[in-house]
Design a protein with these regions (language model features):
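Active-site-adjacent loops and short helices of periplasmic peptidoglycan-processing enzymes
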Residues: 25-176
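Sec-dependent N-terminal signal peptides of Gram-positive bacterial secreted proteins and lipoproteins
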Residues: 4-24
């Protein structure tokens, strides 16, 4: 749990290091944003916010949780683990026009490749594959693990319905939960 929390915090801090300075430089444009939350990383103090608990669609930010849980399960064993692509990994995305790496049913993919594809190409089929890996069987099992992690972290305004972030009514988070 500590490794997952540390990895998740590192990813969020890196995202914040890129996004927050740009937002600060933008000045008044931030006031036109639907929701934002700027938190002191050392103290947890909310420095500025607007609608910080409003439940919004997280899109591909969802993959931060997906990647975090996959990394936690792997515990550094990146190269030896092979994942087998299932029918669900590929065909659950049919008709979504989502980003993918064209995985083929039955294909064996090294864990490290699935991690890179999900992180760098925002591959939704890669996110599905990772969810099956850390969930222990199906994408639904992976999503259940994601929501268990949400509960453990005390994220009151977050719920996942998939591992990739494709829009769904029951898939939401708040900027405070993400901070």
């Amino acid at each position: 749990m500590k490794k997952f929390t540390a990895a998740l915090c590192t990813v969020l801090l890196l995202i914040g290091a890129v996004l927050v300075p740009g937002a600060a430089a933008a000045g008044p444009a931030l006031a036109n944003t639907r929701a934002y939350c700027i938190v002191d990383a050392d103290t947890g103090l909310v420095l500025a916010q607007q609608n910080m608990d409003e439940e919004l669609h997280p899109a591909s930010i969802t993959k931060v949780m997906t990647l975090g849980l996959a990394c936690e399960k792997a515990q550094g064993d990146w190269d030896d683990v092979k994942l087998t692509v299932t029918h669900e990994d590929v065909y659950s995305l049919a008709g979504t026009d989502s980003s993918h790496i064209a995985l083929l049913e039955g294909e064996e993919v090294p864990l490290v490749d699935a991690l890179y594809a999900t992180q760098m190409a925002s591959a939704n089929d890669g996110a599905n594959l990772l969810a099956e890996y850390f969930g222990g069987g199906t994408i639904a099992d992976g999503v259940a693990a994601m929501n268990a992690q949400v509960e453990e972290l005390g994220l009151a305004h977050t719920h996942f319905s998939n591992p990739h972030g494709i829009s769904d009514e029951d898939h939401y988070t708040s900027c405070y939960d993400m901070a």
